[in-house]
UniProtKB/Swiss-Prot annotation:
Assigned EC number: 1.5.3.-
Function: Catalyzes the oxidative demethylation of N-methyl-L-tryptophan. Can also use other N-methyl amino acids, including sarcosine, which, however, is a poor substrate.
GO molecular function, one term: sarcosine oxidase activity
Protein name per UniProt: N-methyl-L-tryptophan oxidase
C-alpha cells in the first residue's frame, strides 16, 4: 500500500498531524520509535504553558492564536478533564526585561488581553508572590496551560477511530526519496508514501544528521505546595525572570504539588543514554531554588522530578521547511523548548502540506536557509 502521508515521530506535532490529515480524508501512517505518549521526548510531565502575547517574538502570535482555537476544539472531546485550562499566565521580571518588552509589544500589535501590574499590584493580587520594587508583571488573562500527554493520547485515539494506520514501538531507520515519493525503512519493513512529515523531536539527527539541531537535557520538578497555589484559589501559571537573566516557568499546584522548571541552561547531550534520570545530575533538585526562595518563598521541599529534552535550533526559533532537494518532505523540528503550545497548529500546517494547500501563515522566518 502507498500512503498519502507518512509521519515520522508521533509525539506532539506528529499526533496532531496524524489527526488533522486523517480527518481531511488522507490515507495516513503514523510512526514512532516508542508508544506515544511516552517519556523519551519533550512532551511528558503532564502540563505545558500556552502564552499568547509571545515574548519570543511577534512572528509567533498568529500561530499561537490559531493553535488556541484548535486547542479549544480538542478540549471539547474531554470536557470532564479539559486539555486546556484557562488559569491565566503572569509574566514576571525586571521592568527593563527584553522578554517582557516583547510580550508587551505582541499584546499591543495584536490587541491581546494583557494587564500590566507594578510590584505592589502583583503582590496585592497574589500574596504568595514576592518581587522586588523594580519588577513588573504582565498578566495574560486568556492564557493558561495544556495537558500535554492527554492531548497526544486524544489525537492518537481520534486519528485511529478515523482510520489512521499507526506503527508504534518501531523506529524509522532510514528515509529514501525517488520519483515515486518517499520510502521509510523500519524493523517491520518498508513503507511508501507520496509525502512525509519528519517531526522526530530530539533525535531527528539520527535520520537527518545535517540538520542544525542540538539536544539538551532539561529537568522540571514538583515542590510541596498547599491550596493557596491552586487554580481554585485563582493562582496563575507563570514565567519569571531573575535579575541575572535566568528564566523560569511554572504552573498552579495540583494535589499539593507545584511544578516548576528553568528554561535556560541544561546539559548538552549527544545520545539518548546521556539523558540520565532526574537527580543524577547534582544540580537537578536545587535548580529552581533561586526562583522559589526569592519569588515563591512559601513553597516547600522538592517532592519529585523528571528529565526531558529540548531540540534546540541555533537561534532557538522553529525549523519549518521542506527537506532541501525534496519538496515532498516537510521538516518540523528545532522547537527549542517552547513548541508544545503550537503542536495543534503545526499539525494542521503539516496536514495542509500533505494536501498541497498553501499555508495561511508566513513561515519564512522558520526556513532552514537562515542558517546558511
Amino acid at each position: 500500500m502507498k500512503y498519502d502521508l507518512i509521519i515520522i515521530g508521533s509525539g506532539s506535532v506528529g499526533a496532531a498531524a496524524g489527526y488533522y490529515a486523517t480527518r481531511a480524508g488522507l490515507n495516513v501512517l503514523m510512526t514512532d520509535a516508542h508508544m506515544p505518549p511516552h517519556q523519551h521526548g519533550s512532551h511528558h510531565g503532564d502540563t505545558r504553558l500556552i502564552r499568547h502575547a509571545y515574548g519570543e517574538g511577534e512572528k509567533y502570535v498568529p500561530l499561537v492564536l490559531r493553535a488556541q482555537t484548535l486547542w479549544d476544539e480538542l478540549s471539547r472531546h474531554n470536557e470532564e478533564d479539559p486539555i486546556f485550562v484557562r488559569s491565566g499566565v503572569i509574566n514576571l521580571g525586571p521592568a527593563d526585561s527584553t522578554f517582557l518588552a516583547n510580550v508587551a509589544h505582541s499584546a499591543e500589535q495584536w490587541q491581546l488581553n494583557v494587564e500590566k501590574l507594578d510590584a505592589q499590584g502583583i503582590m496585592a493580587r497574589w500574596p504568595e508572590i514576592r518581587v522586588p520594587d523594580n519588577y513588573i508583571g504582565l498578566f495574560e488573562t486568556d492564557s493558561g496551560f495544556l495537558r500535554s500527554e492527554l492531548a497526544i493520547k486524544t489525537w492518537i485515539q481520534l486519528a485511529k477511530e478515523a482510520g489512521c494506520a499507526q506503527l508504534f514501538n518501531c523506529p524509522v531507520t532510514a528515509i529514501r526519496h525517488d520519483d515515486d515519493g518517499v520510502t521509510i525503512e523500519t524493523a517491520d519493513g518498508e513503507y511508501q508514501a507520496k509525502k512525509a512529515i519528519v517531526c522526530a523531536g530530539t533525535w531527528v539527527k539520527d535520520l537527518l544528521p545535517e540538520l542544525p539541531v542540538q539536544p539538551v537535557r532539561k529537568v522540571f520538578a514538583w515542590y510541596q505546595a498547599d491550596g493557596r497555589y491552586s487554580v481554585k484559589n485563582k493562582f496563575p501559571a507563570f514565567t519569571g525572570e531573575l535579575p541575572n537573566g535566568d528564566q523560569y516557568y511554572g504552573f498552579p499546584a495540583e494535589n499539593d504539588a507545584l511544578k516548576i522548571g528553568k528554561h535556560n541552561g541544561g546539559q548538552v547531550i549527544h545520545s539518548a543514554d546521556e539523558r540520565v534520570p532526574f537527580a543524577e545530575v547534582a544540580s537537578d533538585g536545587s535548580e529552581a531554588f533561586p526562583f522559589l526562595r526569592n519569588v515563591l518563598p512559601g513553597i516547600g521541599c522538592c517532592l519529585y522530578g523528571a528529565a526531558c529534552t529540548y531540540d534546540n535550533s541555533p537561534d532557538e526559533d522553529f525549523i519549518i521547511d521542506t527537506l532541501p532537494g525534496h519538496d515532498n518532505t516537510l521538516l518540523i523540528t528545532g522547537l527549542s523548548g517552547h513548541g508544545f503550545k503550537f503542536a495543534s497548529v503545526l499539525g494542521e500546517i503539516a496536514a495542509d502540506f500533505a494536501q498541497d494547500k498553501k499555508s495561511d501563515f508566513d513561515l519564512t522566518p522558520f526556513r532552514l536557509s537562515r542558517f546558511q
